[in-house]
Amino acid sequence: YVYEPGQETILPRAWNSDHAATYQSIIGLQEGERPTFAQNLYFMFQHQIGTMYMRYFMWNFAGRESDEQGADWLKPAQWFKKVPAALAENKGRNNFFMIPFVLGLIGMFYQFVKDTKNFSVVALLFVMLGVAIVFYLNSPPTEPRERDYIYAGSYYAFAFWIGLAVIGIFEVISSIVKNGKV
């Protein structure tokens, strides 16, 4: 895609004229208004990283409201909230109570403390196969279907940390039992 000289900017995120109305609603542009650098950054952080990447990430490690297109991840405030029967019975509704997410954070911390060198490798995989791909692909605001599969490598890296959390928790429990503090 080639920009007119007056339209060149660093990090052009809102680029496809076919999606002008969607860009307008997300960024808050007026009709015919061109996005500024700050609005392009807002679109990248709010929509591309926030909605497109983090929502998919949290679907896998926190829970998912439903399998409807555009469904959000299941936040703690929604765990026990009464929802309509159609939503409650939706087979795509998953409530993990954020257990995998918390385990991943524990595993991340455990690996950082125990093995900083290999932590760097897994963290690099996590970033390069997640947020860096979001940055590189510059996806449009609408997709014909959910595209969470493009971030699968990032999810694998986070799954490593979930596994390491189990080892870390086991070590803590076994040291408590050995020292007779139970």
Describe each model-derived feature in a short phrase.
Residues 115-116, 159-181:
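Membrane-interface junctions at the ends of membrane-embedded or membrane-associated helices
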Residues 90-93, 118, 135-152:
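Membrane-interface catalytic loops of GT-C/OST-like multi-pass glycosylation enzymes that act
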